[in-house]
Amino acid sequence: PHALLIVISLAAALLAGAIWGFLPAFFKAKWNTNETLFTLMMNYIAMQLASYFIIVWEVPKGAGKIGIINQDTRAGWLPEVGNAYLLPILIVGLMTVLMYVYLQYSKHGYEIAVVGESQRTASYAGIKVDRVIIRTMVLSGALCAMMGFIMTAGIDHTLTTTIVNSRGFTAVMVSWMSKFNPFIMIASSLLLVTMDRGASEVASTLSLNHSFADILTGIILFFIIATEFFITYKVTLRKSSRKEA
């Protein structure tokens, strides 16, 4: 049945994402590895795995890509509510609310905040740091997989190595700019999308290279990040007070 296929696809995506998130979490908890570098390296593994299965499932053979999946029957497709984007937006909105409640009002959210500030303090407070790290990254992996499921089952209905493009790196920027507040992330995301579309329009109007949009957006983000230094720290200029011998 159509509904059952959606449930199975979602469950498989969440399980795969949770396992993918568990790997760097285990190494972080066990040997204190750098989770940022670890996950960046795993990105290349994920891309090659995707490339492999694209060749295995390519349609037609030799095309090097997968066509629209179940285009005739639409089996496994998320139902359209108004248009292809409305239901994914509603799902993301619901997830945003749930994540805010989880981070702000649950015991797990409190533990994440304490461990993020200082693992040593968390240990003194009786929090099992290793368990928090693994649980948090497994949940993060599952949420990322949820986004991948929405992209494939709700919007693109196909699989490519560039289906998410650079959204993962953009998500890191959005999270940092939003101070990890789920609601502010929505505003930050809209800002980045507006900047990207505006820069693309400028590049198109002036007949510039397609990379110009990324360069312009990067420059703007650079200055936004630079201002964080002056927000966090107070710069004071002092005259040298050396005494003559």
What kind of region is each of these model predictions?
Residues 61-65, 109-114, 233-245:
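Short, Lys/Arg-enriched, Gly/Pro-containing loop segments at transmembrane-helix junctions
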Residues 35-105, 212, 244:
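Transmembrane helix-bundle core of multi-pass membrane transporters
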Residues 13, 138-144, 148-218:
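Transmembrane alpha-helical segments in multi-pass inner-membrane proteins
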Residues 13-19, 43-51, 88-101, 140-147, ...:
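Hydrophobic core segments of alpha-helical transmembrane domains in multi-pass membrane transport
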Residues 1-19:
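Membrane-embedded helix boundary and interhelical linker motif in transport proteins
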Residues 28-30, 103, 177:
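Helix-capping/transition residues at the boundaries of transmembrane alpha-helices
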Residues 81-158, 182-183:
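Helix-loop-helix "hairpin" substructures at the membrane interface of multi-pass membrane proteins
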Residues 97, 124, 128-131, 199-245:
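Cytosolic-side transmembrane-helix boundaries in multi-pass membrane proteins
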